[in-house]
């Protein structure tokens, strides 16, 4: 029995390692990250029925593209793949820290307390504005091996998860900005058009 347990433990460690890719910029990232104005960003994502090698390779390509763009989170619709898949890494400086892969994530609870914090997005480069979101959340999801998981998150992790999950519904952080004057200014200065914002605030 001990041997079986050890085998399971080694298998779990190996599974975590499958998502470790170099946290360095590539000359040519494997996936194109679409920007504000692209139809891809407004398409809802579908649940993933089976977590297989194809899904894991997509997650790795998303990570490679995210690291190249120096981001901390990326959702599949940002690369024109309409599946419920997110990758997040808040520790870009530590090569040994595995990223978080969330498949079919669902927020099951959110704090009544709200927090205001500046957000940016790889799909809207150069634009940084305050967004109000719940301070803490609880969620369920499947990991890169298809196993059901639950987690609690607060602070930056909670914000990042909520931001990336918005992408799965075709919502961008600029849609939640309440400072319209600041939004117009930031968009104009960075070459984006306000007509592509779909306010949900």
Curated annotation (Swiss-Prot):
State the source organism's domain of life: Bacteria
The stretch of residues making up the signal peptide is none
Entry's cofactor comment? Binds 1 Fe(2+) ion.
Q: What is this enzyme's EC? A: 3.5.1.88
Q: Name one GO biological process term.
A: translation
Q: So which cofactors does this thing need? A: Fe(2+)
The record's active-site residues are 164
Entry keywords, A to Z: Hydrolase, Iron, Metal-binding, Protein biosynthesis
Coiled-coil positions are none
| Catalysed reactions, as listed in the record | N-terminal N-formyl-L-methionyl-[peptide] + H2O = N-terminal L-methionyl-[peptide] + formate
Q: Which family does it belong to?
A: Belongs to the polypeptide deformylase family.
Q: What is this protein called?
A: Peptide deformylase
For this protein's source organism, the top of the classification is:
Bacteria, Bacillati, Cyanobacteriota, Cyanophyceae, Synechococcales
């Amino acid at each position: 029995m001990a041997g079986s347990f050890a085998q399971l433990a080694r298998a779990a460690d190996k599974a975590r390692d499958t998502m470790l890719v170099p946290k360095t910029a590539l000359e040519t990232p494997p996936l194109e990250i679409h920007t504000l104005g692209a139809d891809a960003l407004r398409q809802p994502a579908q649940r993933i029925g089976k977590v297989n090698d194809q899904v894991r390779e997509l997650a790795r390509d998303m990570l490679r593209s995210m690291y190249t763009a120096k981001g901390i989170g990326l959702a599949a619709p940002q690369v024109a793949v309409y599946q419920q898949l997110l990758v997040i890494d808040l520790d870009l400086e530590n090569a040994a820290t595995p990223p978080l892969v969330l498949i079919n994530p669902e927020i099951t609870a959110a704090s009544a307390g709200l927090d205001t914090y500046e957000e940016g997005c790889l799909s809207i480069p150069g634009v940084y504005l305050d967004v109000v979101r719940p301070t803490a959340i609880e969620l369920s999801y499947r990991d890169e091996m298809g196993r059901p998981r639950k987690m609690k998150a607060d602070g930056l992790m909670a914000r990042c998860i909520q931001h990336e999950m918005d992408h799965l519904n075709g919502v961008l952080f600029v849609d939640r900005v309440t400072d319209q004057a600041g939004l117009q200014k930031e968009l104009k200065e960075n070459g984006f058009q306000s007509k592509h914002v779909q306010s949900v605030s």
